[in-house]
Amino acid sequence: SSAASDVYKRLRDITVQVGRTGKLTPVAELDPVVVAGSTVARATLHNEDEVQRKDVRVGDTVIVRKAGDVIPEVLGPVLALRPADAVQWEMPRTCPSCGSPVIREEGEVDFRCISIDCPAQALERLLHWASRGAMDIDGMGEEIVSRLVESGRLSDVADYYTLDEVELSLLDMGRVNKDGEPIRLGSTVAKKLVAAIDESRTRPFARALFGLGIRHVGKTIAE
């Protein structure tokens, strides 16, 4: 059913996510709760204006609504339950990923990190390129992309097309097995990934344009 369900949860923290165009989005970190059949531990707060308009503060008990498949939303605080030391939230003035100053342009609601060397933006851009609406590189998810970025092997979308099966199979996944040996990606997954990368070369140009993730260029404009 698409009926909305409301629950009351404690707002443990407000963290900041950095998107592929440098946009900073505040995220409500909640005590996990089951709403409308799924477990919710985070909800978007959109931007600083929205946080201040709703006046939600870390430590507050907040009303969380989930309707259908929509991302859960924080409606507002229960003021009667507010801790005495709760302070109004402000967007950090430096990027949580790279430490560069963030700016908010005239007439814009969003703060942005404008550093071209920001790791969080690079990761999001690389994931966007591989995503279903763009080049659709099947199996190229966040964990693998993160490891490739950390190993210095992937920093630009062109780098995808220089990856080979052997080096992918040896990619250290940052975990160890029960014998304490590093877990590697392995040849089965590597073979599938190389095939998916090759297949992505045949996508129409509009998909590549969308995959580049230029600000204000959505799928329709790209086409």
Residue ranges of predicted features:
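Short, small-residue-biased leader/transition segments that mark boundaries at the very start
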Residues: 1-8
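Structural signature for extended repeat/solenoid scaffolds and their inter-repeat hinge/linker regions
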Residues: 62-223
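Conserved nucleotide-binding/hydrolysis modules and their immediate coupling elements
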Residues: 11-20, 24-89
